Curated annotation (Swiss-Prot):
This is Uronate isomerase. Keywords: Isomerase. It comes from Salmonella arizonae (strain ATCC BAA-731 / CDC346-86 / RSK2980). SUPFAM superfamilies: Metallo-dependent hydrolases (SSF51556). Its EC number is 5.3.1.12. Pathway: Carbohydrate metabolism; pentose and glucuronate interconversion. Pfam families: UxaC.
Length: 470
């Protein structure tokens, strides 16, 4: 019987163990997409206790707590203490066997806290609370300290075009901190014309860009000013959350002006008008990214805020989203081609939330590759509900079968937690075990030099090269 979570966790043969311990584990982390707070990094936040750093804002854990029947007051309630929430989590963790949360919880205790020989649960919670809180009181366990312990080289936060990026500039000016914290442009509110808050958002964009927006060209000018601001602050990537992937041929500016005017007047748009406007903004943005050398990321297929009652109570991003099942292949093909036809398709990473679409994305990438950029269009790592063992394996295997795994830019945390860097470790163990199994089975050569290069490239080198501004 194999012991739970030894140093060789998930590594089933000697080849895998060599690849992980000798080559993957020492590589730095290039976390090009996350939801960390730049303010917390700028302020070098110190966490009061384990409950605070572990559970605050973590909707993965919140969903598990709700599934275990825990009262909402012990999940998000302001009337309960961090310790009470922590104990609710301690009572829930033994019930998560088979869920990636069980693995992540124990990996997070191992690194950075050094707790390697204790299962987390109600019987051990008090001891672990004390041990971890003692460490959290030291400088090595501040927000920056944890990032340094985990060998992070770069993080890409997720930022709205109206953001001042003051905290990014503060971090960049601090020579004592060697980790790059780059903003990522997330313009969802500027192209989702169908959303209730669209008109209010345009008002905020007007103020940030000092442009009065009444026509489509005004919107372009406002976004251009903000793109320039982001570029000046070190941005090299854009991200887009696309629940429903729409496409329609882009009409002329007069028609786009009419669509925008209807929306500003409070009139209802047709589905065609929504698709025309959305496509026009996304295609124009893609061309701007290409001109700047940025990477365009498309996260496709979530259904968000499913629970109206809880959305009214807690707002978005609180654990009430799930996997959508819209067809995406035709619209995605046309969207990418609309940029590529003028040779203005930027480097692009495609993510799907529905694993049914894995092969759709894996094959779509091959349609739009380009000379001089290895893996110009990427099939991104298992996202959200898929960043677990089976989901990561599916993505790696399907990418290898339909593209070039060797050119993959690898893992990202996509997380709001400073403890989630162990997801890179989880991914690296799964990657090394997959390659080790293939080599042991004679499906690929057992060539340490060849395999080690591939591992190190996927863990760090490919992403570092891919996100560089050339």
């Amino acid at each position: 019987m194999t012991t739970f979570m030894t140093k060789d966790f998930l590594l089933k043969n000697d080849i895998a163990r060599t690849l992980y311990h000798k080559y993957a584990a020492p590589m730095p982390i290039y976390d090009f997409h996350c939801h960390l707070s730049p303010q917390e990094i700028a302020d070098d936040r110190r966490f009061d206790n384990l409950g605070q750093i572990w559970l605050e804002g973590d909707h993965y854990k919140w969903r598990a707590l709700r599934s275990a029947g825990v009262d909402e007051s012990l999940i998000t309630g302001k009337e309960t203490s961090d310790y009470e929430k922590y104990m609710a989590w301690a009572n829930t963790v033994p019930k998560t066997l088979g869920n990636p949360l069980y693995h992540w919880t124990h990996l997070e205790l191992r690194r950075p806290f050094g707790i390697t020989d204790t299962l987390f649960g109600p019987d051990t919670a008090e001891s672990i609370w004390t041990q971890c809180n003692e460490k959290l009181a030291t400088p090595a366990f501040s927000a920056r300290g944890i990032m340094q312990q985990m060998n992070v080289r770069m993080v890409g936060t997720t930022d709205d075009p109206i953001d001042s990026l003051a905290y990014h500039r503060q971090i960049a000016a601090d020579d004592s901190f060697g980790i790059e914290v780059a903003p990522s442009w997330r313009p969802d509110k500027a192209f989702k014309i169908e959303l209730d808050g669209f008109v209010d958002y345009l008002g905020k964009l007007e103020a940030a860009a000092d442009v009065n927006i009444t026509r489509f060209d005004d919107l372009r000018r406002a976004l251009t000013r903000r793109l320039d601001h982001f570029a000046a602050c070190g941005c090299r990537a854009a991200d887009h959350g696309i629940e429903t992937l729409r496409f329609a041929p882009v009409p002329d500016d007069a028609q786009l002006d009419a669509i925008l005017g209807k929306r500003l007047a409070g009139e209802t748009l047709s589905e065609l008008e929504i698709a025309q406007f959305t496509t026009a903004v996304l295609v124009w943005l893609g061309r701007q990214y290409a001109a700047r050398g940025w990477v365009m990321q498309l996260h496709i297929g979530a259904i968000r805020n499913n629970n109206t009652r809880m959305f009214r109570l807690l707002g978005p991003d609180t654990g009430f989203d799930s996997i959508g099942d819209n067809n995406i292949s035709w619209a995605l093909s046309r969207l990418l081609d609309s940029m590529d036809v003028t040779n203005e398709l930027p480097k692009t990473i495609l993510y799907c939330l529905n694993p049914r679409d894995n092969e759709v994305l894996a094959t779509m990438t091959g349609n739009f590759q380009g000379p001089g950029i290895a893996g110009k269009v990427q099939f991104g790592s298992g996202w959200w509900f898929n960043d677990q063992k089976d989901g990561m394996l599916r993505q790696l295997e399907q990418l290898s079968q339909m593209g070039l795994l060797s050119q993959f830019v690898g893992m990202l945390t996509d997380s709001r937690s400073f403890l989630s860097y162990t997801r890179h470790e989880y991914f690296r163990r799964i990657l090394c075990n997959l390659l080790g199994q293939w080599a042991q089975d004679g499906e690929i050569p057992d060539d340490e030099a060849m395999l080690s290069r591939m591992v190190q490239d996927i863990c760090f080198n490919n992403a570092q090269h891919y996100f560089a501004i050339k």
